[in-house]
Curated annotation (Swiss-Prot):
A motif ('HIGH' region) lies at residues 41-51. Its main location: cytoplasm. PANTHER family: VALINE--TRNA LIGASE, CHLOROPLASTIC_MITOCHONDRIAL 2, VALYL-TRNA SYNTHETASES. This is Valine--tRNA ligase. Residues 926-946 form a coiled coil. Catalyzes the attachment of valine to tRNA(Val). As ValRS can inadvertently accommodate and process structurally similar amino acids such as threonine, to avoid such errors, it has a 'posttransfer' editing activity that hydrolyzes mischarged Thr-tRNA(Val) in a tRNA-dependent manner. It catalyses: tRNA(Val) + L-valine + ATP = L-valyl-tRNA(Val) + AMP + diphosphate. ATP binds at residue 557. Monomer. Its EC number is 6.1.1.9. ValRS has two distinct active sites: one for aminoacylation and one for editing. The misactivated threonine is translocated from the active site to the editing site. The C-terminal coiled-coil domain is crucial for aminoacylation activity. The gene is valS. Disulfide bonds: none annotated. InterPro entries: aa-tRNA-synth_I_CS, aa-tRNA-synth_Ia, Anticodon_Ia_Val, M/V/L/I-tRNA-synth_anticd-bd, Rossmann-like_a/b/a_fold, tRNA-bd_arm, tRNAsynth_Ia_anticodon-bd, Val-tRNA_synth_C_sf.
Amino acid sequence: MEKIYNPKHIEESLYFFWEKNGFFKPNHLEKSTFCIMMPPPNITGSLHMGHAFQQTIMDILIRYHRMQGKNTFWQVGTDHAGIATQILVERQIFEKEQKTKKDYSRDDFIKKIWEWKKQSSNIITKQMRRLGISVDWDYEKFTLDPDISNSVREAFIILYKNNLIYQKKKLVHWDSKLETVISDLEVEHRLIKGKKWFIRYPIIENDMSLRSKVKYLIVSTTRPETLLGDTAIAVNPEDYKYNQFIGNHVSCPLTNRIIPIIKDRYADLEKGTGCVKITPAHDFNDYKVGLHHKLPMINIFTFDGRIKSTAEVYNYKGEKSNQYSTCIPMQFQHLDILSARIEIIKEITKLGFLEKIEECNVTVPYSERSGVIIEPMLTNQWYLKTSTLAKVALNAVKDKKIKFIPQQYESMYSSWMNNIEDWCISRQLWWGHRIPVWYDDQKNIYIGQNEKEIRQAYSISENVLLKQENDVLDTWFSSGLWTFSSLGWPKKTTFLKTFHPTNVLVSGFDIIFFWIARMIMLTMYFMKDKHNNPEVPFKNIYITGLIRDEFGKKMSKSKGNVIDPLDMIDGISLSELIKKRTNNLLQPNLSDKIIQRTIKQFPEGIKSTGTDALRFTFSALASSTRDIQWDMNRLKGYRNFCNKLWNASRFVLINTQDHNFSKFDVKRKMLLINKWILIEFNNTVKLYRESLDTYRFDIAANILYDFIWNIFCDWYLEFVKIVIKLGSSKEVYCTKNVLVYVLELLLKLAHPIMPFITETIWQRIKLIQNISEKTIMLQDFPEYNHKLFDKKILVQMNWMKKIIVFLRNIRTNMNVSSTKLLPLFLYNINSEQEKVIKENISLIKNISFLDKITILSEKYDKDLCIKEIIDGAEIIIPILKLVDTKVELKRLVKEQKKTELNIFKIKTKILNKDFLSYAPTKIVTQEKNKLLKLNEINLKLSEQIKIFRNMSYKK
């Protein structure tokens, strides 16, 4: 095995070896199964940290269950990501050709996207392979594959025929740049400085004496441009000021439209004037008021965000109405919305309708996709009824058929589902699943897989022109079918029968409603068990936290804090990293700031750590918290951990390569250290498996780290070196046998988290053990053996270790070189302890650099000594002749002064209110931890100074 651990030399070739030999494939169909559906990443770019994190977690689970002999299947695929992909390709086409989507036919534009998709998918799959994910690539799916598209159309048809899908004109969030409806959850609400305009609405009523007293109702609004679509003024029924006006009418400024004054509790007595203009076609709250009072709805905006030349008037049911005129003043026609606002303010000021203007803060909705202001728009869309579906999905979680891990996310899920509204499933895009609806000239609706099927089913002749619906389905609709459409539904395939329902979904809390809830609803509607009961899509939902930067900030390109997982695996120079972070910025003015931040954070670029170190870091950070702060120092530390395992394995291989250890009997007679390591490993297996079984990957990583670094390397290997050097031939052979046996099991234990390094080492170990199988990933995972537990062995070994630690501390604290051999005296030891000393005397002497070990029958009072009671036994080290007390005392006093100065500095800092108020929480915590450590050091220094002063006094 190579002397230096170099992950680059082993990882890519090893993945090719795994894939070529079909080790990732599901097999043994008669065995128990374990299946995960990978949340398909969007094809819009490369994998980010969140993808790498979640895919690592999923791969750990798949490898773990595969090694338990289960028939594992991990569905891999990518999502067509309708809006995001169309935006990206439109932008690229404009940059290259100065053309827009409208310069192409629909088919030609879609061809452009397919060309781009091939390029993007190759990047994503390459990244996945570098992460080591063990998926069967022969079953890779794309959400626009023909079989998936067939499933999506079939689902739509069934839902429509069962009266769960309908078409209706409703108010939606409209993106005027993309010219499509977007989800409520894709709207970002920003608080900005704005204005409130107070506008006079002339009162129209028969009582002229009343009119002479009050001529206007004054209404405040932050959107004066929408007054062109007003259909009522609302006042609160408890507002006595306006009771006399309820049932009367006002004239709408600029349009002279006569609209009613209505009573509704939506009008807030404490806000504005108490009067609210109601524009049902352009405000969500107004829309609800309009439905309640059966008000007309007047649409005044075009889909691209301009004032229409002719208004559209509908009744509250969304049907065309002639209740009001469709005329819009000519001077406002075709203006964009903000320009129209300016012109309308000018006109109402000129005509005397403006009362006053006030500065205020306004919450404005923006599209997360395009960045433009969202307009509430009255449009004809397709909807899925959700109330019945949601009830079944809610009960599945309540009845524990589906469990959230951590459990805290159940309440988030329940809250959303209890307040769910019908789902708008149509989008005004070209890229996506085109809705399987056709219309004839009379606007009759026909539903089917394709036009040919429809003509046959409805007996429509070729002479009748049929036109397909232009809209596509919301991306989340096809994604909601993912757990069963990817397995072949509606066909009853072997894979569908074998792997559904799946075992666990690994996802983020940010898409619990977007995707997870909808998946549960749709799956339980379409999938039924043998008793015709709704089948859940998965039994467990493991929700990961969100990966943030070291300061707790969300990673984004605009902040310049994004890290590509592959850049940590393979390394990247500073210049390349800067280029990557500043390329294609939406806000180029941020470039200098991002460059400076990058230089400060990574002055030498990012060094290669390899995949296993990255995967181990992800595992160690996978706690149950909502936010996870990325820590490059931990990544570096786990790179060192991989190196530690590599070097330890080299030591084992170098010392055992000439042997054949095909059999091992744990019951054979052996040294205490060998019995102990077997028990420790057995306990580690128990705790490790419990952690993986309960999705505590962070605990599993810490257990593995502690065993490899502290128990196996720092203790056991140090003992083994002495046995190999000084032990009898039987002791040496047995110890080497145990060494190989434990390492081979340890590699299997670590394999799910660290697949590359463990496979590489195992390929060497298997030769020594005469193992014929090709790969570690198909080996049996270590199991806990309760018969191996022996408390007596642990007590004996722990006592011996405590003595060794005590001796090491004396050398460290008193600055005694290892070349100076110490005498050790023991007093008041029991028979078991005496047995441990006698049987392991050579080990203890050599590991602690002792010249002799003496068991006393009487107390030791001859020389100045350090004594320690360890498990009832008195451990004695004479120290009078070990060191120059004056020199050592001087050194200790100097060290203490330095420590006390540092304590003073940190205390001053953490008592400073400004520091506590403005410093990041992480920095404050670090300073407090430093203080605790310095106080511990200072206490030890005081104890040592006291000892040496006593020694000087006795001399």
